[in-house]
Amino acid sequence: MSEIKTDDPKRGIKLRGADKTARIPIKVVPLQEKLKKPEWIRAKLPSRKFFEIKDILREQKMHTVCEEASCPNIGECFSKGTATFMIMGDICTRRCPFCDVGHGRPNMLDPDEPKNLAESVKAMNLRYVVITSVDRDDLRDGGAQHFADCIKAIRETSPNTKIEILVPDFRGRLDIALKILAETPPDVMNHNLETHPSLYRKARPGANYQHSLDLLKRYKEMMPHIPTKSGIMVGLGETDEDVREIMRDMRAHNIEMITIGQYLQPSDGHLPVLRYVTPEQFKIFEKEAYELGFSNAAIGAMVRSSYHADEQAAEALRESHGGCGHH
């Protein structure tokens, strides 16, 4: 079990927006004039199912990343009866200025969370669940055992539900984290590169591009039958060629599934959107991804890491278990 100090007066205080990004190496400078949001950036309105799921989540005291990160697809995904759960609280130890999740010193892990999560998955009757988390640099294993406990709990109560985990980078704790997650594997292993390495100091302070690539490569070597997946955002200052370079790097590290979506600025305290990639360019990226050998590519303005994850995974899982799916 991961251990942390219990007597920290700042524990549980959540910073957001400009308060959160005040101490990162490169300051967030708002654009003089914001880029106008193009007409293809549109989210669907929520249905009744959306509100039913919200009620279940509050009842179980669960956090979804859909809500915490202000995802534009929340209405559509909840209405389909799918959700991405965020475990280990809603306070992150990192200060990434593209992300709308709060920063601070997190609370103690909740030992009942795996059980509560499993009950939520069962109550929502999910056939596919994505589990992600805040970064927990305060824990000795980065939270890997808590991920494993959640996987075990869901397997017990919903054995037919497929599980994807979207993990943090386990900085400084990678060996132990990979060992734990190889002993209790998910159905899909996902870890996001987020952006081009030239933008890491600005967008992902505290993370390392090569470390993130190695995380997925090493896991694939340990667990060859588990599909690996990664995603990036566009609009932070990268070029089209930067995107192609990331795709090539992913394939060189045996990453099989990819997501690429448009970055949308959650508030003025976050990094500004420097470009809106057109639907035509997203189509070109999608074609290039399949040419590079990705088994599945979810690429488009409104795509997020777990958007249509169930459909994406169906293909990869068939292929990794000897099936013969096609795009």
Swiss-Prot record:
This is Lipoyl synthase. Its cofactor is [4Fe-4S] cluster. It is an enzyme of class 2 (transferase). It is found in: Cytoplasm. GO terms for molecular function: 4 iron, 4 sulfur cluster binding; lipoate synthase activity; metal ion binding. Signal peptide: none annotated. Binds 2 [4Fe-4S] clusters per subunit. One cluster is coordinated with 3 cysteines and an exchangeable S-adenosyl-L-methionine. Gene3D superfamilies: Aldolase class I (3.20.20.70). Residues 78-295 form the Radical SAM core domain. The keyword Metal-binding applies. Its EC number is 2.8.1.8. InterPro entries: Aldolase_TIM, Elp3/MiaA/NifB-like_rSAM, LIAS_N, Lipoyl_synth, rSAM. The keyword 4Fe-4S applies. Keywords: 4Fe-4S, Cytoplasm, Iron, Iron-sulfur, Metal-binding, S-adenosyl-L-methionine, Transferase. It catalyses: [[Fe-S] cluster scaffold protein carrying a second [4Fe-4S](2+) cluster] + N(6)-octanoyl-L-lysyl-[protein] + 2 oxidized [2Fe-2S]-[ferredoxin] + 2 S-adenosyl-L-methionine + 4 H(+) = [[Fe-S] cluster scaffold protein] + N(6)-[(R)-dihydrolipoyl]-L-lysyl-[protein] + 4 Fe(3+) + 2 hydrogen sulfide + 2 5'-deoxyadenosine + 2 L-methionine + 2 reduced [2Fe-2S]-[ferredoxin]. GO terms for cellular component: cytoplasm. Pathway: Protein modification; protein lipoylation via endogenous pathway; protein N(6)-(lipoyl)lysine from octanoyl-[acyl-carrier-protein]: step 2/2. [4Fe-4S] cluster 1 binds at C66, C71, C77, S306. Pfam families: LIAS_N, Radical_SAM. [4Fe-4S] cluster 2 binds at C92, C96, C99. Belongs to the radical SAM superfamily. Lipoyl synthase family.
